[in-house]
Amino acid sequence: MSMPKDFTFTDYKPYDFANRRHIGPSPAEMDEMLKVVGYPSLDALIDDTVPPSIRQRTPLAWGAPMTEREALDKLRETANRNRKLVSLIGQGYYGTITPPVIQRNILENPAWYTAYTPYQPEISQGRLEALLNYQTMVCDLTGLDVANASLLDEATAAAEAMAIAERVAKSKAKAFFIDENCHPQTIALLKTRAEPLGWQIVLGDPFEDLDAAGVFGAIFQYPGTYGHVRDFSGLIAKLHGQGAIAAVAADPLALALLKSPGEMGADIAIGSTQRFGVPVGYGGPHAAYMAVKDAYKRSMPGRLVGVSVDARGNRAYRLSLQTREQHIRREKATSNICTAQVLLAVMASMYAVFHGPDGIKAIAQSVHQKTVRLAMGLEKLGYTVEPDVFFDTITVEVGKLQGIILKAAVAEEVNLRKIGTTRIGISLDERSRPVTLEAVWRAFGGDFKVEEFEPDYRLPQELLRTSAYLTHPIFHMNRAESEMTRYMRRLADRDLALDRAMIPLGSCTMKLNATAEMLPITWPEFSEIHPFVPADQALGYQHLIEDLSQKLCAITGYDAISMQPNSGAQGEYAGLLAIRAYHIANGNEHRDVCLIPTSAHGTNPASAQMAGMKVVVVKVSDAGEIDMDDFRAKAEQYADTLSCCMITYPSTHGVFEENVREVCEVVHKHGGQVYLDGANMNAMVGLSRPGDIGSDVSHLNLHKTFCIPHGGGGPGMGPIGVKSHLAPFLPGHPQTDGHEGAVSAAPFGSASILPISWSYCLMMGGEGLTQATKVAILNANYVAARLKGAYDVLYKSAKGRVAHECIIDTRPLAESAGVTVDDVAKRLIDCGFHAPTMSWPVAGTLMIEPTESETKAELDRFCDAMLAIREEARAIEDGRMDKVNNPLKNAPHTVEDLVGDWDRPYSREQACFPPGAFRVDKYWSPVNRVDNVYGDRNLVCTCPPIESYAEAAE
């Protein structure tokens, strides 16, 4: 058959991920944008933006990019290399059942996983309500007054509890007591945190070894890692008598049956909510919790959701007590924790909403009864089972049979916990079935059926819970799945996430989180692997981690990578600890000074303080660059004690500084190391490598540059890359290499989200990653060019260029029209946008980072909105609008405003449909502007009465 004359083959590649799916502007749109910016080509723009002195010499290359289908096939092949056995290892990680309605409507829903930390409360009301439910759940179960909105993991939470204890204790002691029944990873991390701060660790049996007068605090595990359930009330009273603080690490499921830490008198309770519907995922991510007595709420780290009111007096939620956080208090902050595990906290809260108190109690009772049955069978076989009273964990003395039994259990497709050389630990959970118990009995040499044993109760009578929990109606009113689904949908609709609009937050890199990248995280072969399984059962994970590490080394120019840090802040901390350990190993213990520019992110000085360093601040010039005269002077002044400097590159002002190599040379000349914060790596991938320009260590925000979603405030990953001389000092872990220095509970941090970044690298390829960086720079310069004349771009290079973000100055609006940066941010909500980063690193400004994923149409919509806001300010300047009663001061406008009595000197049309706003699919803020002062003065951090829900629904 002859081919028609007008028929031609095309090179259309529908699954070319980099150019057709991830990068927003088309080639034709890029040409249009380049004309606006004033360049003939993308490469010409890059040549003028990235200094030649730091340009990468060789291109990124590791094979052709994969299509989505090819990458998913590769992921499936890798996942299948993991062996999915039933793990009864426990140690803080347990099998759980994620209700499908929660998996589909929260975990797999971009309305939840692509949102940002809820700093803008008006567009975060759904997430904030879910987090308030979480805080209420934690307060109820722990019996304490105030809970935060999650921490990174249980071990990190324990370290934060120790830090609180040292801060608030009346005792002047410098030692902290750790219950030997705490999980090993918790003990390891507490040791890591204490050592740089000069705190002594005392480890032992609290009933035998605790000297209350000699410590500023203590932590107890409840139930213990080996199963013990003990009453700590007397010990807590002794600690209080000596001015010390008591913390309890408690299993929230056990608290459904056991007396709460608060009822024992504990000051702090911490733990993990992993078993509330969040898969183990080879170690994470999971939401840790912390609750404290009311007196200590201002010393608590992390985010804290509170109840306030909006401009109409209606109930509204917001983040409370933010002045205690690291971005304000810097080296004086309670912690370096920046964000935590919001998505997982939401899942855990919905698990409690789904099951209610009776369901949670029934699950706990079932787990306990199964454990009792298991113990009865083992006792019948003649084994010694400890302890006498327990919840879900038992320890069996097996002598020389340990290896044989563990091997037999694996043959039954069950993992048990090896304890020492003669004991075996077994922890049951929600997923444990009768066949599980029977398989364990067979491994121990028995052949029983579950029905042969009638379980008794093996919890201590004096510790049985009598107090109520989850009493708020929210934990009772959504049992039918229809109502549960609608409730989650209503909350999602109140929020603004990437599934609705671009989120141009500077220093946050809110890029595409592609569906193909997200799919594998729910595969059981990834999600159901316990972090402490034998290495040969996690070969898929090991391959993924090794290959991703190699790719990150190629991208950064570093020699080694640690995947352990489970946030950017933890990456900073781990990197600084590596520097500290390096100096100590070389006999330079006295090197403890860290130079940090005034423009640095607040986590930098907070992390340095935690690593035992003294922060010396370096000036920044009017051009936004490090003041080299001051830098040289400080480096010379502290030459004998200089440990390191911390810089961000490109700078936090959105510019590639020409002098970065000189900065590194000055530090090295005076015996220090260079920590380069990788927060802005999205402007460097494929164009410049930190390891090539003089940096010794960096952390990488995989939840920024490498596509892990922000989850509304977590999860994240902050692996660190180091040059070879620092590699021996990367974090260790007691469960793997036995080395010290653990910074996260699990050896590879939040491992189950690493497939996202790996998929991204596979589908983009080296060339695609480089192109993404170039387009990110183009998009930022395009926005700057379009806003020129209306707003000044505060910092630019000598050639007038910005990097991947730009800072626009809104301070003139305050002077000429009384319009604040807050007014601009709230007016953007009316336009359907999340505001750019406000007042950082310069007060009264907006930092805009569009990323490479946004199309020209979306960039234009945002620019149109910003230009319209400038015209509204001009109308105030000219007297055409009232200075107080105008669309900017009254923003955001709600449906209630639209349909209510209208007495404003501007139209409903102007109020609700400004340029940039969609008419059919408009986002409506559910509340008017939130009163921040009221919320802090009238702090309420648990669910309000049911009447307020009814009022909100009317």
Swiss-Prot record:
Protein name, UniProt field: Glycine dehydrogenase (decarboxylating)
Function: The glycine cleavage system catalyzes the degradation of glycine. The P protein binds the alpha-amino group of glycine through its pyridoxal phosphate cofactor; CO(2) is released and the remaining methylamine moiety is then transferred to the lipoamide cofactor of the H protein.
Taxonomic lineage of the native organism: Bacteria, Pseudomonadati, Pseudomonadota, Alphaproteobacteria, Hyphomicrobiales
Substrates-to-products reaction catalysed: N(6)-[(R)-lipoyl]-L-lysyl-[glycine-cleavage complex H protein] + glycine + H(+) = N(6)-[(R)-S(8)-aminomethyldihydrolipoyl]-L-lysyl-[glycine-cleavage complex H protein] + CO2
Keyword Oxidoreductase: yes
CDD domains assigned: GDC-P
EC assignment: 1.4.4.2
CC annotations in GO: cytosol; glycine cleavage complex
Pfam hit, one: GDC-P
Enzyme's top EC category: oxidoreductase
Cofactor(s) essential for the protein: pyridoxal 5'-phosphate
Self-association and partners: The glycine cleavage system is composed of four proteins: P, T, L and H.
Keyword check for Oxidoreductase: yes
